[in-house]
Amino acid sequence: MSLTKQYFKYVSQNIFGLLGTSCYILADTYFISQASGTSGVALLNLCLPIYNFIFAIGSMLGLGAATRYAILRAQGDERSERYFSNALLWALVFALPFMLAGVFCPEVLLRFMGGDAEIVALGVGYARIFLLFTPFFMCNYIVSAFVRNDSDPSLAMVATLCGSLFNVVFDYIFMFPMGLGLPGAALATAVSPVLSIAICSRHFFKKSSTVRLVRQLPSPKLLAQSCQLGVSGFVGEMSSGVTTTVFNLLLLRLAGNVAVAAYGVVANYALVATAIFNGVAQGAQPLVSRCYGKNDAAGARKLLLLGSGTALALAAALYAVLFGFTGPIVAVFNSENSALMAQYAFSGMRIYFLGYFFAGFNIVAAGYLGAVDRPAEASATSLSRGIVAIVACSLVLSALFGMNGVWAAFPASEAITACLTLFLLKRKN
């Protein structure tokens, strides 16, 4: 199979898989909006940064270890076998604080995220359940990354889609027929990665599998080597959490809970958009790492060009759909028919999503830099878009233009990052 055909196979399957992951957040938002109105949407938006932090750690461990594994395997290095078990062990270590927070102090965590008394009272049960399932969220990221890098992207896609479908169906069953409310939504979301891991585990019984569990203690050295390549994935996932936290605080100050609920609508659709571009980057990563391990620089550059072109085309298609149907798209999560929330979300969607013309390229380029063992440049791109530029732009533009300035911070920061990314790519290429 030609490199181009492999690229489209890996990328398309990975996009579908990650779209499935983002869809269970959308399902949560929809059912919670039906059950609890704008307060429920505001609660979920306050919880999104916690989800992002959990996924970020899973991404750093999974993508970093799997990338290191793919490079070493392409070079015939037997040390590649140790990275899978090590990543799983460290996931259990990193998950422990989240589990303890879920048991002992979920209300403290919700207050820290900006929740008022109403939101905290509403969300304690929801937060407690999903925090207790943190190990499964992290390990799911690791298992799917290794299955994908071991030449089985189809199974990784099927596992993710099945987990997401379970979440959507049981969100409804747990919340309404069974009457569990918000804790039911959390339970459906929490069990979803358990099912995905079980399906992915089939890969390890195939004769073609080269991924093995190795009896070992957690190795700080292997962790550092993995995180070196996974830190851009960590920052990339965290960028959503940082953006959500900063925007929540600014919007609370500017217009209160209704503005936060409006941003909840924007943020949930943004999760879907980001999943699409992460699908391009993560789908190309095994092929780029394989080319790099075999010293095929031309192949790696070809994949970068394919990824950048794909990202631009997808951004244009995404914005065209959003611009044409902004009203109905916003109305899906506006169960109370709040005119003010609809007004805020309508303008927010149209301004915010301009950023994906730049963000798609930045995500693909950061994935490429990590896949070819250039972690410093990958981290610089991810840090710029995820923390430095977005925080600076949101503070400055909100002071100048109010709520529209908050929405404009995302496209402005991504445009700045795109300039930095082009400089980093051209410096060595």
Task: Outline where the language-model segments fall.
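Short runs within selected transmembrane alpha-helices of multi-pass transporters and secretion channels
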Residues: 62, 129-148, 156-167, 185-200, ...
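Alpha-helical transmembrane segments of multipass membrane proteins
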Residues: 26-30, 100, 142-146, 168-173, ...
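Hydrophobic transmembrane alpha-helices of multi-pass small-molecule transporters
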Residues: 53-56, 167-171, 197-201, 271-275, ...
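Membrane-helix interface/capping residues of multi-pass secondary transporters
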Residues: 29, 38-41, 153, 182, ...
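Short alpha-helical transmembrane segments in multi-pass integral membrane proteins
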Residues: 1-15, 69-133, 177-231, 288-355, ...
